[in-house]
A protein has these predicted regions:
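DNA major-groove recognition helix of helix-turn-helix/homeodomain DNA-binding modules
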Residues: 52, 56-73
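Alpha-helical residues within the helix-turn-helix
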Residues: 21, 32, 65
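DNA major-groove recognition helix of helix-turn-helix
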Residues: 34, 45, 49, 59, ...
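Interfacial/linker helices and their anchor residues that mediate assembly or domain coupling
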Residues: 79-117
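Short alpha-helical DNA-recognition segment
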Residues: 24-47
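Residue-level signal for the short linker/turn that defines the boundary of a DNA-recognition helix
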Residues: 14, 24-25, 40, 55-58
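A short, Lys/Arg-rich alpha-helix, primarily the initiator
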Residues: 1-22
Length: 117
């Protein structure tokens, strides 16, 4: 298995667990809310959170919807990017477009230079 696959699984696992806990849901509650069988719901979510198994895209999308977070949040590779995705996700589509335009304008004013931490 490639390192990037392991990293992506680990990121998804960490963000899933944090979002589920923030939502106040048990693993079983989350699993059943996304259509997993009641008998295996907790085990499946636990395996996703432990990074043992990958959720397929359709399941990951249902999980994100159930948790009220954008799908991209679950895969964001930095905390800052994850926070930005969550924040943008709270805005209406028109507000999202304006926020992105504002960010692009700020970047253009800075001459396209970006500081990396």
């Amino acid at each position: 298995m490639a390192q990037t696959e392991v990293d992506a699984r680990s990121i998804f696992a960490q963000r899933l667990k944090a979002a589920r806990e923030d939502a106040g849901l048990t693993q079983k509650e989350l699993g059943t809310s996304v259509g997993l069988p009641q008998e295996t719901a907790a085990v499946r979510i636990n395996r996703y959170e432990k990074g043992v198994h990958d959720a397929d895209l359709a399941t990951a999308r249902r999980i994100a919807q159930s948790l009220g977070v954008p799908l991209a949040f679950l895969y964001a590779d930095t905390d800052v990017l994850a926070e930005a995705i969550l924040t943008l996700g709270l805005l209406s589509k028109s507000e999202q477009r304006k926020a992105v335009a504002d960010l692009k304008a700020r970047l253009a004013q800075a001459g396209g230079a970006v500081e990396k931490d």
